[in-house]
Curated annotation (Swiss-Prot):
Similarity comment text for this entry: Belongs to the organic radical-activating enzymes family.
Quaternary structure (record): Forms a tetramer composed of two NrdD and two NrdG subunits.
A UniProt-annotated Pfam family: Fer4_12
Disulfide bonds: none
Gene3D superfamilies documented for this protein: Aldolase class I
InterPro entries the UniProt entry points to: Aldolase_TIM, NrdG, Organic_radical-activating, Radical_activat_CS
Swiss-Prot/TrEMBL catalytic activity: glycyl-[protein] + reduced [flavodoxin] + S-adenosyl-L-methionine = glycin-2-yl radical-[protein] + semiquinone [flavodoxin] + 5'-deoxyadenosine + L-methionine + H(+)
Cofactors that this protein relies on: [4Fe-4S] cluster
Source lineage: Bacteria, Pseudomonadati, Pseudomonadota, Gammaproteobacteria, Enterobacterales
Cellular compartment(s): Cytoplasm
Keywords attached to this entry: 4Fe-4S, Cytoplasm, Iron, Iron-sulfur, Metal-binding, Oxidoreductase, S-adenosyl-L-methionine
Protein known as: Anaerobic ribonucleoside-triphosphate reductase-activating protein
Predominant place of localization: cytoplasm
Chain sites annotated for binding [4Fe-4S] cluster: C26, C30, C33
Species in which this protein is naturally found: Salmonella typhi
């Protein structure tokens, strides 16, 4: 997996103070997407064990309380990203108790395959659906267009 940007302290992409990771790779290529640079799987930089360790350390840093992590992109549920996203989410569950996990994807919940559902079964919130320019609404919270759904899973 590759990623474009990591924010160790973020107050924009989800509730509270959190970490945010923007991964590479998106098959949806939504017109009007604000993050087109993340579409190509080979763009950005490699997601390494060192980066994963940094995320875990940041989530556990007691100097800045973080509510959790937001995973966006690109698309964290792109089939080629799922193995690394699953490993990261499993590690967060094991090593960062009480942290919530939000995932943004262009897939709808009812379109997800078994591998993608392994990730979804471990997260707190899934924001699903492609961004649709004609349905864009800046007043929406945590989503860009009105067709997207915020699923509070646990």
């Amino acid at each position: 997996m590759r990623y474009h940007q990591y924010y160790p302290v973020d107050i924009v992409n989800g509730p509270g103070t959190r970490c945010t990771l923007f991964v590479s790779g998106c098959v949806h290529e939504c017109p009007g997407c604000y993050n087109k640079s993340t579409w190509r799987l080979n763009s950005g930089q490699p997601f390494t064990k060192e980066m994963e360790d940094k995320i875990i350390a940041d989530l556990n840093d007691t100097r800045i309380h973080r509510q959790g992590i937001s995973l966006s992109g690109g698309d964290p549920l792109h089939p080629q990203n799922v193995p690394d996203i699953l490993a990261l989410v499993q590690r967060i569950h094991a090593e960062c108790p009480g942290k919530d996990i939000w995932v943004w994807t262009g897939y709808r919940l009812d379109e997800l395959n078994a591998a993608q559902m392994q990730v979804v079964n471990l997260i707190n919130v899934l924001v699903d659906g492609k961004f649709v320019q004609d349905l864009k609404d800046p007043a929406l919270i945590w989503r860009g267009s009105s067709n997207q759904v915020v699923h509070h899973l646990r």
